[in-house]
Amino acid sequence: MARRPVFQEVTETTPPGTTPSGGMIDAGHKGARGAIRLWLVVLFVMVAAMIALGGATRLTGSGLSITEWKPVTGAIPPMDAATWQAEFDKYRQIPQFELVNSDMDLASFKRIYWWEWSHRLLGRLVGLVWAAGFVFFLATRRIPTGWTPRLLLLGALGGAQGAIGWWMVHSGLSGEMVRVASYRLATHLGLAFAILGLIAWYVLALSRSEAALLRARRAGEAKLFSMTTGLMHLAFVQILLGALVAGIDAGRMYTGWPTMGGEWIPAEIWDATLGWRNFFENPALVQFIHRMTGYLLAVFAVVVFLRARRSPHPVTRGAYVAMLVALAVQVALGIMNVLHASPLPLALAHQIGAVALFTLILRARHHARYPYETSVRGTVR
């Protein structure tokens, strides 16, 4: 039998006009990746809306208006005067009413009730959209190989988020607490951003075939990816610190910038009676740390951006430009919040800005790991 030349074996293994299989991400029914990606985009938008609505609920002082956790029957709001009065009577028994809102009437209670009810309802809808989508894709065998655990993880984290939400609310229903515990608020918000980040990463992973991702990873920029990973973690820490600021209303203690009460380091930064609790309960220290971390985040982001400018991939460079623009807007919003004592519109814009910035950091990080190829003609692949 005649021998085949080595080069002939390599070049003729795959017949002309055919393409290699995409692998596990491309497994399943045709178009499954696109359908799952669309479902995840819907979930991403809903979770982002949850974060914004949660911020509005906190800023309007509405978070303790519903004093019970009823995951199923709680979806039905009060429908008559007697039920409304019963809900109001429950609220009147907690410290927030007794110490802060003792002059509140039923009409005012209804306004804060609707904020909290809407926030919880949206959470239930997120759970339903996840469950319906997961069951559908599982039943029709459209979930690509290896993706079932990832999608299940989203559902598990969503369930945990509901339980943590109640754990947070419960902290403000007894004793002398007139708001939820700040560290529980930070836990609740942190998990929300973790879920949002996971969904965003999955959406990006499903935007190309596995074969394309494998090719792209060979051209990935390890140093830039590592630096952006550090930036992502620092941004997450800053988000948690922002929750601590919000939890004790520390943003309104000092309304000057760049100094705090005319000092670079405020005299009230440490209360010896609080000890380690200064980091959670001392408004001066909490705001100071949030400011300093913000400066560090901004400087590090510029360093990462300058490194990204050396990337040979135009799409990657563009992703880092978008990230830096979002950071500049977020810094400006933070300063404006300080100067104007965090009015609701500005404070809400600052929280939405955090969502945008965190998402764009993740996007830039993904492009550093899986850059898009650009042909000689300038087309992106």
Swiss-Prot record:
GO CC aspect terms: plasma membrane
Main localization of the protein described in the UniProt heading: membrane
GO molecular function: metal ion binding; oxidoreductase activity, acting on NAD(P)H, heme protein as acceptor
Cofactor annotation: heme b
Function per UniProt: Catalyzes the conversion of heme O to heme A by two successive hydroxylations of the methyl group at C8. The first hydroxylation forms heme I, the second hydroxylation results in an unstable dihydroxymethyl group, which spontaneously dehydrates, resulting in the formyl group of heme A.
Family recorded in the similarity comment: Belongs to the COX15/CtaA family. Type 2 subfamily.
Protein name in the entry: Heme A synthase
